[in-house]
From Swiss-Prot:
GO biological process: mRNA splicing, via spliceosome
InterPro entries documented for this protein: Dim1, Thioredoxin-like_sf
Main subcellular localisation: nucleus
Signal peptide segment: none
Assembly and oligomerization: Component of the precatalytic spliceosome (spliceosome B complex). Component of the U5 snRNP complex. Component of the U4/U6-U5 tri-snRNP complex.
Protein species of origin: Dictyostelium discoideum
Function summary: Plays a role in pre-mRNA splicing as component of the U5 snRNP and U4/U6-U5 tri-snRNP complexes that are involved in spliceosome assembly, and as component of the precatalytic spliceosome (spliceosome B complex).
Disulfide partners: none
A Pfam family that the UniProt record links to this protein: DIM1
Protein name: Thioredoxin-like protein 4A homolog
Subcellular location: Nucleus
Length: 160
């Protein structure tokens, strides 16, 4: 299987090859597979998507450090394209994305960068844990502001 996969990587000339490694029975892989299947038609001119069971490609497991539940990697003309997601690991996405548009945007960025000869591209969105924490904190502040506004409106209505 590993040889067949490498052959496929070398024969695809015009599109990015997106490979989700893992196990079909893994819940994280199932989530990622749903996202990938739902966007496959939208990205068909930019990318071809494969899912690969890591037990069938043991030689690639150590080569690409496929130890996470659901690593997704990108290749263009048999060259590994890295993506800076803000996580510190530029080799692969090692979690299941929850947003279809995020995956489409990443594939588009990889496609455009790879066609220009870049081996590393910057993700259009920051996925760093620090960013996620700040985003949650901001949402809490916004909720508090909304509650205050609602209280003021209720008081005005009550007084009138």
């Amino acid at each position: 299987m590993g040889g067949l996969l490498i052959k496929q990587l070398s024969t695809e000339e015009d599109r990015v090859v997106v490979i989700r490694f893992g196990h079909d029975y893994n819940p994280e892989c199932m989530k990622q597979d749903d996202i990938l299947a739902s966007i496959a038609e939208k990205v068909k001119n930019m990318a071809v998507i494969y899912v690969v069971d890591i037990t069938e490609v043991p030689d690639l497991n150590s080569m690409y450090e496929l130890y996470d539940d659901c690593p997704t990697m990108f290749f263009y003309r048999n060259k590994h394209i890295m993506v800076d997601l803000g996580t510190g690991n530029n080799n692969k996405i090692n979690w299941a994305l929850t947003n279809k548009q995020d995956m489409i945007d990443i594939i588009e960025t990889v496609y455009k960068g790879a066609r220009k000869g870049k081996g590393l591209v910057n993700s259009p969105r920051d996925f760093s844990p620090q960013y996620k924490f700040l985003k949650k904190k901001k949402k809490k502040k916004n909720k508090k502001k909304q509650k205050k506004k609602i209280k003021k409106i209720k008081k005005k209505i009550k007084n009138n």
